C-alpha cells in the first residue's frame, strides 16, 4: 500500500478530455508521485474506466477523485472524496456523500478512502459554478475553513483549489502554517516549473492539471521542480 502523506507532486487527469497514449505514457513515467483522475463535468463510468485501464499499464499510483457516484468503479488504489467547505449547497458538503454511503457503505474499503476538505477560490471555475462556492472570501475566512478541516473535522487533506488561475502564494503560506495534521494540497493555474516550485515551498502536495493538455513539456518539468530530483 502506498503512503499518500509523502506525495509532493501529482498530476490530475480529466477523463472528459482527450490525451494521447504517448502523452499519457510521459505523465505516468515522469516520476510524479501519483495520478488523480477527476473532473467537474462530463465524468462517466465509461471514460473513467478507459482512463483506469490506460493508467494501469504503468506502475504509478492511481486515485479516483469522486465527483459522480455513478462513475465509481473498483480498481483504483485510493478514492478521494471532496467536500466543498465553502459551497452554498449542502449537497456538496455532505449530501452527495450521504447518498453514496447509503448505497455503497457496506462494501467500502475504508483504508482506500480519504476525504478532502476543498476551498474553491476561483469564481470563474467550473467547480465553483457547479458547487455554488462562495469565493468572495477574506484570508481570515480561508484560514477558518482550514481550521475547520484540520482541527474540527480532522480531515486528512485540505485542498486549496484555484482551478485555472494561479493562486495567492502568501495565502498558501499562511494556510500551511495553520495546519497541524491535514496535508495541504494546492491546485490551480500552474503553467511552468517556476510556479510549481514556488507553491511547493508551502503546499505538501502540488497538483498539476490543465497544463498537461496545453503544453506537455512544461507539465513534465513541474515534477523535477517540485521534487527537487
UniProtKB/Swiss-Prot annotation:
Residues that, per the record, bind Mg(2+): 14, 40
Catalytic activities: sn-glycerol 1-phosphate + all-trans-heptaprenyl diphosphate = 3-heptaprenyl-sn-glycero-1-phosphate + diphosphate
Gene Ontology terms describing biological process: glycerophospholipid biosynthetic process
Any one GO molecular function term: heptaprenylglyceryl phosphate synthase activity
Top-level enzyme category: transferase
EC number annotated for this UniProt entry: 2.5.1.n9
Family: Belongs to the GGGP/HepGP synthase family. Group I subfamily.
Quaternary structure (record): Homodimer.
Record-linked NCBIfam families: GGGP-family, PRK04169.1-1, PRK04169.1-3
The name this protein goes by in its record: Heptaprenylglyceryl phosphate synthase
The organism of origin for this protein: Bacillus cereus (strain B4264)
